[in-house]
Amino acid sequence: MNYKYLIIGGGMAAHSAIGGIRGIDNEGSIGMFTGETDPPYDRPHLSKGLWTKGESLNDIWRDMNSDSVDLHLRTLITSIDITNKSVIDDIGKTYTYEKLLVATGGTPRRLPFGSDHIIYFRTAEDYRTLRTLTDTQQRFLVIGGGFIGSEIASSLRQNGKEVIMVFPENGVGANIYPNDLSNFMNEYFADNGV
């Protein structure tokens, strides 16, 4: 199958690219490939609004129908041939393109050991898993003090859970914010039981 625009990834950058494409080309075929099981959604809600604002998963899905996008869920692109303008997916199917965007986003670092109770929080499926754990567990360890780690810690705490945060930096958001703000956040989290 050939696409005028082939996008690898299903996050916010990919969705924004589709909006930009449709702003200049209403007819060109678009194929979006993502390894996720869910259609594109607003990722920030996973660590905030779904926990504290009474939102549901139905509130976060992005409308893909109006943009005429062929959405390939649970599909990983394993090879890119820039010379021949083609990609191969994880079952060996080849797709060609005129323009390619790789917008896969980042993935959390993995620990050198595993457990069913370790969640590398990034996807709607990760949200579902963590939400299910909150039904049976009271104590949570959040590794990471950046945006997602601090949002998850805050959301869990606001839902009455005991939360411990661990991070290699000197404070919450230390790699993101000025020292004064990071120090304030440390105090704020500690004052609120984290």
Regions inferred by a protein language model and the residue ranges of each:
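Amphipathic alpha-helical segments in well-structured domains
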Residues: 127, 181-182
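Glycine-rich Rossmann-fold phosphate-binding loop(s) that bind the pyrophosphate
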Residues: 9-12, 122, 144-146
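Beta1-alpha1 glycine-rich phosphate/pyrophosphate-binding loop at the start
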Residues: 2-70, 155-180
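Helical element adjacent to the flavin cofactor pocket in flavoenzyme catalytic cores
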Residues: 61-71, 185-194
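FAD-binding core/adjacent interface of flavoenzyme oxidoreductases
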Residues: 1-6, 62, 66-141
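N-terminal Rossmann-fold NAD(P) dinucleotide-binding loop
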Residues: 14, 149-150
